[in-house]
Amino acid sequence: MPLVELLTSAALGLSLQLLHDAIIRAKERSLITRCILDRLDATLHKITPFVIKIDTLTEEVDEPFRKVIEELKRLLEKAIRLVDAYAELKLRNLLRKYRYKRRIKELDSSLRWMIDVDVQVNQWLDIKKLMGKMSEMNTKLDDITRQPMDIIEATGRSSEEDGCTKPTIDIHFRWKNQTKEHEIRFIFK
Protein backbone atom coordinates (compact mmCIF):
# COMPACT_ATOMS: atom_id res chain seq x y z
CA MET A 1 0.00 0.00 0.00
CA PRO A 2 1.52 3.35 -0.97
CA LEU A 3 2.39 5.68 1.88
CA VAL A 4 0.10 8.49 0.68
CA GLU A 5 -2.96 6.22 0.66
CA LEU A 6 -2.04 4.82 4.08
CA LEU A 7 -1.75 8.34 5.48
CA THR A 8 -5.03 9.36 3.85
CA SER A 9 -6.95 6.46 5.37
CA ALA A 10 -5.28 6.99 8.74
CA ALA A 11 -6.04 10.70 8.53
CA LEU A 12 -9.70 9.94 7.81
CA GLY A 13 -10.00 7.69 10.84
CA LEU A 14 -8.14 10.17 13.02
CA SER A 15 -10.25 13.08 11.75
CA LEU A 16 -13.40 11.12 12.50
CA GLN A 17 -12.24 10.40 16.05
CA LEU A 18 -11.15 14.01 16.65
CA LEU A 19 -14.49 15.31 15.39
CA HIS A 20 -16.37 12.93 17.68
CA ASP A 21 -14.29 14.13 20.65
CA ALA A 22 -14.90 17.77 19.70
CA ILE A 23 -18.66 17.12 19.56
CA ILE A 24 -18.60 15.57 23.02
CA ARG A 25 -16.71 18.59 24.39
CA ALA A 26 -19.12 21.00 22.70
CA LYS A 27 -22.14 19.13 24.10
CA GLU A 28 -20.76 19.52 27.61
CA ARG A 29 -20.36 23.28 27.19
CA SER A 30 -23.53 24.13 25.29
CA LEU A 31 -26.78 22.56 26.44
CA ILE A 32 -28.99 24.83 24.32
CA THR A 33 -27.81 23.62 20.90
CA ARG A 34 -27.33 19.99 21.77
CA CYS A 35 -29.77 18.86 19.03
CA ILE A 36 -27.53 20.15 16.23
CA LEU A 37 -24.52 18.45 17.70
CA ASP A 38 -26.51 15.23 18.19
CA ARG A 39 -27.47 15.32 14.53
CA LEU A 40 -23.84 15.82 13.49
CA ASP A 41 -22.84 12.97 15.80
CA ALA A 42 -25.48 10.74 14.18
CA THR A 43 -24.03 11.64 10.79
CA LEU A 44 -20.61 10.59 12.09
CA HIS A 45 -21.99 7.23 13.14
CA LYS A 46 -23.44 6.89 9.65
CA ILE A 47 -20.07 7.78 8.10
CA THR A 48 -18.05 5.35 10.24
CA PRO A 49 -18.82 2.20 8.16
CA PHE A 50 -18.00 4.20 5.03
CA VAL A 51 -14.61 5.18 6.48
CA ILE A 52 -13.94 1.55 7.40
CA LYS A 53 -14.69 0.53 3.80
CA ILE A 54 -12.37 3.25 2.56
CA ASP A 55 -9.64 1.90 4.83
CA THR A 56 -10.01 -1.54 3.26
CA LEU A 57 -10.19 -0.21 -0.31
CA THR A 58 -7.31 2.26 -0.29
CA GLU A 59 -4.97 -0.27 -1.87
CA GLU A 60 -6.36 0.17 -5.35
CA VAL A 61 -8.46 3.30 -5.68
CA ASP A 62 -8.99 5.22 -8.87
CA GLU A 63 -8.31 8.93 -9.28
CA PRO A 64 -11.95 10.09 -8.92
CA PHE A 65 -12.36 8.02 -5.76
CA ARG A 66 -9.12 9.47 -4.38
CA LYS A 67 -10.53 12.97 -4.96
CA VAL A 68 -13.66 11.99 -3.02
CA ILE A 69 -11.49 10.74 -0.15
CA GLU A 70 -9.61 14.04 -0.10
CA GLU A 71 -12.90 15.98 -0.14
CA LEU A 72 -14.21 13.92 2.78
CA LYS A 73 -10.98 14.52 4.69
CA ARG A 74 -11.29 18.26 4.06
CA LEU A 75 -14.92 18.28 5.23
CA LEU A 76 -14.02 16.42 8.43
CA GLU A 77 -11.20 18.87 9.20
CA LYS A 78 -13.55 21.79 8.58
CA ALA A 79 -16.10 20.21 10.91
CA ILE A 80 -13.50 19.86 13.67
CA ARG A 81 -12.62 23.55 13.40
CA LEU A 82 -16.28 24.62 13.36
CA VAL A 83 -17.31 22.51 16.36
CA ASP A 84 -14.30 23.63 18.40
CA ALA A 85 -14.93 27.30 17.57
CA TYR A 86 -18.64 26.87 18.32
CA ALA A 87 -17.90 25.37 21.73
CA GLU A 88 -15.59 28.27 22.62
CA LEU A 89 -18.21 30.97 21.98
CA LYS A 90 -19.86 32.57 24.97
CA LEU A 91 -23.61 32.42 25.42
CA ARG A 92 -24.11 36.15 24.96
CA ASN A 93 -22.53 36.17 21.48
CA LEU A 94 -25.75 35.07 19.79
CA LEU A 95 -25.02 36.37 16.29
CA ARG A 96 -21.81 34.38 15.99
CA LYS A 97 -23.49 31.32 17.54
CA TYR A 98 -26.22 31.56 14.91
CA ARG A 99 -23.62 31.78 12.11
CA TYR A 100 -21.69 28.77 13.43
CA LYS A 101 -24.90 26.83 13.91
CA ARG A 102 -25.88 27.51 10.31
CA ARG A 103 -22.42 26.45 9.07
CA ILE A 104 -22.58 23.25 11.12
CA LYS A 105 -25.99 22.46 9.62
CA GLU A 106 -24.62 23.04 6.11
CA LEU A 107 -21.61 20.86 6.85
CA ASP A 108 -23.85 18.11 8.20
CA SER A 109 -26.03 18.20 5.10
CA SER A 110 -22.99 18.13 2.80
CA LEU A 111 -21.58 15.12 4.68
CA ARG A 112 -24.93 13.34 4.37
CA TRP A 113 -25.13 14.22 0.68
CA MET A 114 -21.61 12.97 0.08
CA ILE A 115 -22.40 9.64 1.69
CA ASP A 116 -25.89 9.20 0.24
CA VAL A 117 -25.49 10.50 -3.31
CA ASP A 118 -21.96 11.30 -4.37
CA VAL A 119 -20.11 8.31 -3.00
CA GLN A 120 -21.60 4.96 -3.90
CA VAL A 121 -19.07 2.63 -2.31
CA ASN A 122 -21.28 -0.43 -2.50
CA GLN A 123 -21.85 0.10 -6.20
CA TRP A 124 -18.14 0.61 -6.70
CA LEU A 125 -17.46 -2.68 -4.90
CA ASP A 126 -20.03 -4.47 -7.06
CA ILE A 127 -18.51 -3.03 -10.21
CA LYS A 128 -15.07 -4.10 -9.03
CA LYS A 129 -16.32 -7.67 -8.40
CA LEU A 130 -18.01 -7.76 -11.81
CA MET A 131 -14.85 -6.54 -13.50
CA GLY A 132 -12.90 -9.31 -11.75
CA LYS A 133 -15.41 -11.93 -12.89
CA MET A 134 -15.35 -10.56 -16.44
CA SER A 135 -11.57 -10.73 -16.46
CA GLU A 136 -11.70 -14.31 -15.20
CA MET A 137 -14.23 -15.26 -17.88
CA ASN A 138 -12.09 -13.62 -20.58
CA THR A 139 -9.08 -15.58 -19.36
CA LYS A 140 -11.02 -18.84 -19.51
CA LEU A 141 -12.30 -17.98 -22.97
CA ASP A 142 -8.77 -17.23 -24.13
CA ASP A 143 -7.59 -20.56 -22.71
CA ILE A 144 -10.34 -22.38 -24.58
CA THR A 145 -9.62 -20.68 -27.88
CA ARG A 146 -5.85 -21.16 -27.55
CA GLN A 147 -6.05 -24.92 -27.03
CA PRO A 148 -4.54 -26.91 -29.88
CA MET A 149 -7.15 -28.21 -32.26
CA ASP A 150 -6.96 -31.13 -34.58
CA ILE A 151 -7.92 -29.81 -37.98
CA ILE A 152 -8.42 -32.37 -40.64
CA GLU A 153 -9.04 -31.30 -44.19
CA ALA A 154 -9.82 -34.11 -46.47
CA THR A 155 -11.25 -34.37 -49.86
CA GLY A 156 -14.15 -36.75 -49.92
CA ARG A 157 -15.12 -39.08 -52.68
CA SER A 158 -13.72 -38.27 -56.01
CA SER A 159 -15.88 -36.71 -58.63
CA GLU A 160 -15.58 -39.76 -60.84
CA GLU A 161 -17.18 -42.03 -58.21
CA ASP A 162 -20.05 -39.64 -57.58
CA GLY A 163 -20.67 -38.68 -61.08
CA CYS A 164 -20.44 -35.00 -59.94
CA THR A 165 -18.06 -32.42 -61.23
CA LYS A 166 -17.61 -30.59 -57.84
CA PRO A 167 -15.06 -31.76 -55.27
CA THR A 168 -16.13 -32.24 -51.61
CA ILE A 169 -14.16 -30.64 -48.77
CA ASP A 170 -14.51 -32.03 -45.25
CA ILE A 171 -13.21 -29.87 -42.34
CA HIS A 172 -13.24 -31.41 -38.90
CA PHE A 173 -12.42 -29.46 -35.70
CA ARG A 174 -11.83 -31.31 -32.43
CA TRP A 175 -10.89 -29.89 -29.05
CA LYS A 176 -11.00 -31.03 -25.49
CA ASN A 177 -12.32 -28.97 -22.60
CA GLN A 178 -11.60 -30.00 -19.02
CA THR A 179 -13.99 -32.97 -19.06
CA LYS A 180 -15.66 -32.87 -22.47
CA GLU A 181 -14.52 -33.40 -25.99
CA HIS A 182 -16.07 -31.22 -28.67
CA GLU A 183 -16.12 -31.57 -32.43
CA ILE A 184 -17.45 -29.55 -35.31
CA ARG A 185 -17.55 -30.84 -38.84
CA PHE A 186 -18.05 -28.80 -42.01
CA ILE A 187 -18.63 -30.39 -45.38
CA PHE A 188 -18.46 -28.25 -48.49
CA LYS A 189 -19.58 -29.60 -51.84
Curated annotation (Swiss-Prot):
Keyword annotations from UniProtKB, A to Z: Coiled coil, Glycoprotein, Hypersensitive response, Membrane, Plant defense, Transmembrane, Transmembrane helix
GO cellular component, one term: membrane
RPW8 domain span: 1-153
Domain of life where this protein originates: Eukaryota
Localization (cell): Membrane
Protein's membrane topology: Single-pass membrane protein
Transmembrane segments: 7-24
GO process terms (BP): plant-type hypersensitive response; response to fungus
Coiled-coil intervals: 65-92, 126-147
The keyword Oxidoreductase belongs to this UniProt entry's keyword annotation: no
Glycosylation sites: N177
Main location: membrane
Induction: Expressed in leaves after powdery mildew infection (e.g. Erysiphe cichoracearum UCSC1).
Family note: Belongs to the plant RPW8 protein family.
Function: Probable disease resistance (R) protein.
UniProt-recorded name of the protein: RPW8-like protein 1
Organism: Arabidopsis thaliana (Mouse-ear cress)
